[in-house]
């Protein structure tokens, strides 16, 4: 299909600006562009068709089953969209006086209170805008904590070898050196290796729990002191906090930092590709002095004070999880967590019965990992081939080749919003793909056959990305 710039024609715009309702003020010369921006110019019908064509090439939760592991691609209740669309949120300006945004600040304050209740933390900040952003914030807080004590020699962050690639990247960006901690054959952090890695230069540990293999470490490293007499916070990357509800808040596990992701795990907004949604950070009581400002605190009259500071997009994002949590209540949130775990174990068992091999045996939490290593050796069919074949059946592929400690990995996360019938249909599709892999492997090498886009050159896209349109006159 044509790019939007290729459809553009000079003067064919459809913008209608409202009449000016404030005194006109000239823009200072230093802020003016020297040349006009090269924006696409299309009629509204062409513009609408262009984006409809793009939508047909995409796959969303409303199009079908979306078991993308570690991303929690659950269905979004429309109630959250109504809450986020209220003028009191969408019409806010960052520089409005605090007394004019008391309603939005009340939502922020109440959202923080609910998240503290869920996580067991003493304080929450709503500042981060994305998952890796949240990691980065946590690492900066770790650095600020050590520096506040005059301890500037702690420059090493411990990261499990099964961690998200964003973990070491965030640590490096925050100025730390990364030291990898190996996993046990069960896919859990090797505590002996962790003890050996700890030293006077250790700043902290980044840990995902449940871990990406789908297992819950019931006792966190540090709860049984793998780092005796050594100071170092634990940064728990709790990607799916609702999976823990009813199982004990993080604050009771000795954790000091935890980033729940309400818009993602409790209620996430639509997002392109697999981009993370906004992350909220929780901290135990000795962290708040280092937390980002402005905090949203309540006065004795139970109304948010002016300390909330300028309004930010946080209020718009926070209205979604706030509405979601209020709608579910304590019982509903716990039921959602239990259903997510039940769905993952149900689908895992169905796929094992169909002939697939789980990377790690036993019960899982919210997600699980298959290994297709033996299938590839026997038939030449890879995890990529199976994932592409799922697209022909109207199912979005799971996460591929992650975690890195599992060869030919497929990570499934069915989420709690999927029905048993959907899981049965997905299991049947994957059973048929397995049969085809053994009987007609060449057909799977060519999958998908029915989608608008087949197999793009992902290596070239990663190494030579084209992120800017090449205008003919350039």
Residue ranges and their predicted role:
Residues 129, 184, 208-210, 371-375, ...:
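Short strand-loop junctions, especially beta-strand C-caps/beta-turns
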Residues 1-123, 308, 325-474:
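Non-catalytic terminal extensions of PLP-dependent enzymes
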């Amino acid at each position: 299909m044509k790019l939007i710039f290729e459809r553009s024609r000079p003067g064919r715009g459809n913008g209608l600006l409202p009449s000016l309702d404030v005194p006109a003020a000239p823009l200072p010369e230093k802020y003016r562009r020297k040349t006009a921006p090269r924006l696409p110019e299309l009629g509204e019908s062409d513009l609408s068709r262009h984006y409809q064509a793009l939508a047909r090439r995409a796959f969303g939760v409303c199009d079908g089953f979306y078991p993308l592991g570690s991303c929690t691609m659950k269905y979004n209740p429309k109630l959250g969209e109504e809450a986020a669309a209220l003028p009191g949120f969408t019409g806010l300006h960052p520089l409005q006086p605090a007394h004019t945004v008391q309603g939005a600040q009340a939502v922020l304050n109440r959202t923080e209170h609910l998240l503290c209740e869920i996580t067991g933390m003493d304080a929450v900040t709503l500042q981060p805008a994305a998952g890796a952003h949240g990691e980065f914030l946590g690492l900066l807080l770790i650095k600020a904590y050590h520096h506040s004590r005059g301890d500037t020699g702690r420059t090493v962050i411990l990261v499990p070898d099964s961690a998200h690639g964003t973990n070491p990247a965030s640590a490096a960006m925050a100025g730390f050196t990364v030291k990898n901690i190996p996993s046990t054959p069960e896919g859990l952090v090797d505590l002996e290796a962790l003890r050996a890695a700890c030293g006077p230069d250790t700043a902290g540990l980044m840990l995902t729990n449940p871990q990406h293999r789908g297992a819950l470490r019931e006792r966190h490293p540090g709860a049984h002191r793998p780092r005796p007499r050594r100071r170092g916070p634990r940064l728990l990357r709790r990607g799916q906090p609702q999976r823990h509800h009813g199982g004990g808040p993080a604050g009771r596990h000795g954790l000091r930092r935890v980033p729940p992701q309400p818009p993602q795990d409790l209620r996430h907004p639509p997002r392109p590709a697999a981009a993370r949604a906004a992350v909220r950070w929780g901290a135990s009581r000795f962290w708040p002095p280092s937390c980002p400002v402005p905090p949203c605190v309540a006065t004795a009259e139970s109304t948010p004070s002016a300390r909330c500071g300028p309004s930010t997009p946080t209020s718009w994002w926070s209205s979604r999880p706030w509405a979601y949590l209020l709608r579910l209540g304590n019982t509903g949130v716990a039921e959602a967590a239990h259903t997510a775990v039940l769905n993952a174990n149900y689908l895992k068992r169905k796929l094992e019965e169909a002939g697939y091999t789980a990377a790690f045996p036993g019960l899982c939490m919210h997600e699980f990992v298959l290994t297709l290593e033996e299938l590839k050796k026997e038939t030449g069919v890879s995890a990529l081939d199976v994932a592409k074949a799922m697209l022909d059946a109207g199912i979005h592929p799971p996460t591929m080749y992650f975690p890195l400690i599992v060869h030919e990995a497929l990570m499934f996360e069915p989420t709690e919003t999927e029905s048993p019938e959907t899981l049965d249909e997905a299991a049947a599709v994957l059973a048929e793909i397995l049969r085809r892999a053994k009987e007609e492997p060449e057909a799977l090498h060519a999958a998908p056959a029915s989608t608008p886009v087949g197999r793009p050159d992902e290596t070239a896209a990663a190494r030579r990305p084209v992120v800017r349109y090449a205008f003919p006159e350039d």
